[in-house]
């Protein structure tokens, strides 16, 4: 187990130098959800995170004492017909298994909340698998479970 504590964790936007650490967690995230994406999608997404003209971002949780990236969150801005203000969708959130329950997940979500407020888009939402009970223990502390059911187009 890591010695990571909430006070020892900083969250910041990714930089070009973070690609390897972000990619390591991105691959672990895919393993967790038993999915696999092509490697060139990593480059494509990371490029979008760094492009100031694209409203898609990534942030990382860094263990201050070791400078190790222990968590990542990917999020983007979109319009809605339900409000004049845009919304923020958290697309992906992952914390290294050895660093969980130390505050990184909550700090990553709070980072998105803070950025959403700065953008004037305070509405932030995300979804998770019904079976991801451990994550839901955090999510009910930082948000609420919406009474919605997600449907998807068959085959996609």
From Swiss-Prot:
Protein keywords: Acyltransferase, Chromatin regulator, Transferase
Enzyme kind, highest EC tier: transferase
N-acetyltransferase domain location: 9-156
Reactions mediated catalytically: L-lysyl-[protein] + acetyl-CoA = N(6)-acetyl-L-lysyl-[protein] + CoA + H(+)
Enzyme nomenclature, EC number: 2.3.1.48
Keyword DNA-binding: no
InterPro entries found in the cross-reference section: Acyl_CoA_acyltransferase, Diverse_Substrate_AcTransf, GNAT_dom
Residues involved in acetyl-CoA binding: 93-106
PTM info: Autoacetylates in an intermolecular reaction.
A biological process term (GO) from this entry: polyamine acetylation
Signal peptide residue numbers: none
Positions of the record's site feature: Important for catalytic activity: 139
Family, similarity comment: Belongs to the acetyltransferase family. GNAT subfamily.
Subunit field text: Forms homodimers in the absence, and homotetramers in the presence of acetyl-CoA.
Protein name, as recorded: Histone acetyltransferase HPA2
Species for this entry: Saccharomyces cerevisiae (strain ATCC 204508 / S288c)
């Amino acid at each position: 187990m890591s010695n990571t504590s909430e006070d020892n964790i900083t969250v910041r936007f990714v930089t070009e130098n973070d690609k390897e650490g972000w990619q390591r967690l991105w691959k672990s995230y895919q393993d967790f959800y038993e999915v696999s994406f092509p490697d060139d999608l990593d480059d494509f997404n990371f490029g979008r995170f760094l492009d100031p003209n694209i409203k898609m971002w990534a942030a990382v949780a860094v263990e201050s004492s070791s400078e190790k990236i222990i968590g990542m969150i990917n999020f983007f801005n979109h319009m809605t017909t339900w409000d004049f203000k845009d919304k923020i969708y958290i697309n992906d959130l992952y914390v290294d298994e050895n660093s969980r329950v130390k505050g990184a997940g909550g700090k990553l979500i709070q980072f998105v909340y803070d950025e959403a407020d700065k953008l004037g888009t305070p509405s932030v939402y995300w979804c998770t698998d019904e079976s991801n009970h451990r994550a839901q223990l955090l999510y009910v502390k930082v948000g609420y479970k919406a009474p919605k059911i997600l449907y998807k187009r068959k085959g996609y």
